[in-house]
Amino acid sequence: MANSKSAKKRATQAERRRQHNASRRSMMRTYMKKTIAAIEAGDKEAATAALAIATPLLDRMATKGLIHKNKAARHKARFTAAIKAL
């Protein structure tokens, strides 16, 4: 456990960031699942709408450092290709 005042503060801040990041990661996964569900259902309009919400969200998470930028690009490319194939 942290002994110094600064170490205690860092531990508190790290826990706060962990909870914040967990919330953001959960939100990101939820929107990705909505996009996947629309694609699997074969609903092109719903999939396009879900992708329109998920794309800037993935970009934002990559910018914030929550996920790697290549992971965001990979998901966007795969979702777009899957929607075009519908």
From Swiss-Prot:
One of its GO terms (molecular function) is small ribosomal subunit rRNA binding. Residues 1-27 have a biased composition (Basic residues). InterPro entries: Ribosomal_bS20, Ribosomal_bS20_sf. GO terms for biological process: translation. Keywords: Ribonucleoprotein, Ribosomal protein, RNA-binding, rRNA-binding. Residues 1-28 are annotated as: Disordered. One of its GO terms (cellular component) is cytosol. It holds the Pfam family Ribosomal_S20p. Belongs to the bacterial ribosomal protein bS20 family. Binds directly to 16S ribosomal RNA. HAMAP family: Ribosomal_bS20. This is Small ribosomal subunit protein bS20. The lineage of its organism: Bacteria, Pseudomonadati, Pseudomonadota, Gammaproteobacteria, Vibrionales.
